[in-house]
Amino acid sequence: MKYEGWPDEGELVVGKVDDIEDFGVFVDLEQYQDKRGLVHVSEVASGWIKNVRDHVNEDQTVVAKVLGVDESAQQIDLSLKDVNDHQHSDTIQEWKNEQKADKWLTLAFGEDMADDQFRRIANGLLADFGSLYDGFEQAAIHGHEALADTALEDDEIDAIVETARDNVSVPYVTVTGYVSLQSPDGDGVDTIKDALQAAEGNGEVPDEVDLDVTYVGAPEYRLRVQAPNYKTAESALEAAGDRAVDSVTAHDGSGAFHRERQLDDDA
């Protein structure tokens, strides 16, 4: 997806070197529709430049900083020397991520997706998440909940979530829930302790799952699960809550699993 309009001053943009002259370098902007910028020779690199071609090549992909935009003159002034290695690496990675997300949109809605639908969905994700990639990543981690406040239709959300979970690589996801546990009998402390051990799985939690149980204030305990994907994390979280509740109720206590704290969380 290429943006319509113009880049902002100070923005880092990805471009391809189109033409090299003695006075500077013309760069076609990869993220903007039909936009071209000029890197004056003084902005190609620090120090005296004898030959511009010693620093850039035609068709080279570069990251440039936007120094100024004159829409009336159709002119964009760029700098290569003002971009450090870290900025270059991050900007290229973000650009590649957006290219991936473009393909995911096509996977979600098909090759024959109408241009106006593509723009509407893409603009919706950009408005809420800042980038298409971040929208898909949040959909992969949090599912439908991540897109609930967007202007997308239900069937569009379904398609994005399904595609995200099939294609987005998330190093790990973290989900959190709470259990309220109470036991009125004389052995209540031991009953609660047994319930917490049950929540932790008694050594039966899969190796790919990291489960942590912490006390946050009577009668609530926090369950925090880290796992390689959303489905695994959610399954492990719900199973931990069920184990704790089943254990305490089996000893005439009471328990409940819930997503949010029932009291103010100062922990």
UniProtKB/Swiss-Prot annotation:
One of its GO terms (molecular function) is translation initiation factor activity. Gene3D superfamilies: EIF_2_alpha (3.30.70.1130), Nucleic acid-binding proteins (2.40.50.140), Translation initiation factor 2, subunit 1, domain 2 (1.10.150.190). The keyword RNA-binding applies. One of its GO terms (biological process) is translational initiation. Transmembrane segments: none annotated. Belongs to the eIF-2-alpha family. This is Translation initiation factor 2 subunit alpha. The lineage of its organism: Archaea, Methanobacteriati, Methanobacteriota, Stenosarchaea group, Halobacteria.
